[in-house]
UniProtKB/Swiss-Prot annotation:
The name this protein goes by in its record: Large ribosomal subunit protein bL12
One Pfam family recorded for the sequence: Ribosomal_L12
Keyword Ribosomal protein (UniProt): yes
Species assigned in the record: Acidovorax ebreus (strain TPSY)
CDD domains, per database record: Ribosomal_L7_L12
Molecular function terms, GO-annotated: mRNA binding; structural constituent of ribosome
Gene3D superfamilies cross-referenced by the UniProt entry: 3.30.1390.10, Single helix bin
Length: 126
């Protein structure tokens, strides 16, 4: 039986809260897992504190280090990422190194860095 993701999401969307609760319980029993949120591990001593802080970082900055040789492609990428106008994006690229995006999720930041690198720029995730 082929059950694709879209059909599954449609089925979930039509379920009531009670039905969803029963589904969660059935999944827990079937696979031996728990839907309870995991508690954050307690912070270690002073030596482990720095490593724990680095792992917990949730907001990232995308930094344009260098525009590279293909400035036009980089300006287009910056416009796509930021939604800036042409002049603002050009000024940002010309003023490198500069933050392109600040305080964004890791997945979004990685996607932005990838787009800038593909356009020929040198970009960093901080």
């Amino acid at each position: 039986m082929a059950f694709d993701k879209d059909a599954f999401l449609t089925a979930l969307d039509s379920m009531t809260v009670l039905e969803l609760n029963d589904l969660v319980k059935a999944i827990e029993e079937k696979f031996g897992v728990s839907a309870a949120a995991m508690a954050a591990p307690a912070a270690g001593g002073a030596a482990g504190g720095g490593a724990a802080a680095a792992e917990e970082k949730t907001e990232f900055n995308v930094v344009l280090a260098d525009a590279g040789a293909n400035k036009v492609a980089v300006i287009k990428a910056v416009r796509e990422i930021t939604g800036l106008g042409l002049k603002e994006a050009k000024d940002l690229v010309d003023g490198a190194p500069k933050n392109v995006k600040e305080g964004i999720a890791k997945a979004d930041a990685e996607a932005a860095v990838k787009k800038l690198v593909e356009a020929g720029a040198k970009a960093e995730l901080k």
